[in-house]
From Swiss-Prot:
Location, primary (coarse class): secreted
Stretches that traverse the bilayer: none
Protein name per UniProt: Hainantoxin F5-22.36
Keyword Secreted: yes
GO molecular function annotations of the record: sodium channel inhibitor activity; toxin activity
CC annotations in GO: extracellular region
Taxonomic lineage: Eukaryota, Metazoa, Ecdysozoa, Arthropoda, Chelicerata
Amino acid sequence: CNGRDVPCDPDPAKNRRCCSGLECLKPYLHGTWYQDYCYYVEK
């Protein structure tokens, strides 16, 4: 799985999902073209 701050893809077929506890999100303040990254999300 992909660790924190590593590029990811929400498409499961690409097998670039984030590790447990991380979510695949677009960086804040970037355009929609921008790569998704794994971020730690407080529950």
